[in-house]
Amino acid sequence: MARRNRVAVALVLLSVTVLLCGCSKERMCRVPVGDATCQIEPDSPLYPGLNSTSGYEYLYGGYQGIVVIRTGWRDFVAYERTCPHDKGVLRMAPDYGNMVLECPDCGSRFSTFAEGTTVEGSVTSCSLYQYATYFDGRILYISNYETF
């Protein structure tokens, strides 16, 4: 009889766990991310948009491309161009000097100065996927991984 009770308790606990995990009201932010391991020389003529602060360039890589933004003389950020809401391809949008990425499909807008957080639109809790970057003074390394 004790074995039957333990099995019943285990089944009840398993059912409760499945229900609690499956009924979350929060939207999971899973953006597909492709291989983004690359190296560029941001001060070269190949990337004129990165020759000044607040400049940007689109790169191949990742899932639907990468946007690299120069935020300071030696500082860069790199974001996946896939919208967390509907997987549309993001593009830089003019916003009075603010660096904002916009999804043409759902209208969501993301601040590149605030770690890719949502400014407005359909997505309220999902930020852009940010790639790891490292600049050694000449070469900018971009990767899905934290180590270089």
Model-assigned labels for residue ranges:
Residues 18-22:
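C-terminal motif of bacterial Sec signal peptides marking the signal peptidase cleavage site
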Residues 15:
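Conserved nucleotide-sugar donor-binding subdomain of glycosyltransferases
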Residues 1-12:
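Bacterial N-terminal signal peptides that target proteins for export
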Residues 24-97, 111-115, 129-148:
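N-terminal pre-ligand scaffold of iron-sulfur
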Residues 97-107, 117-132:
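Short cysteine/histidine-rich metal-coordination sites, predominantly Zn2+-binding motifs
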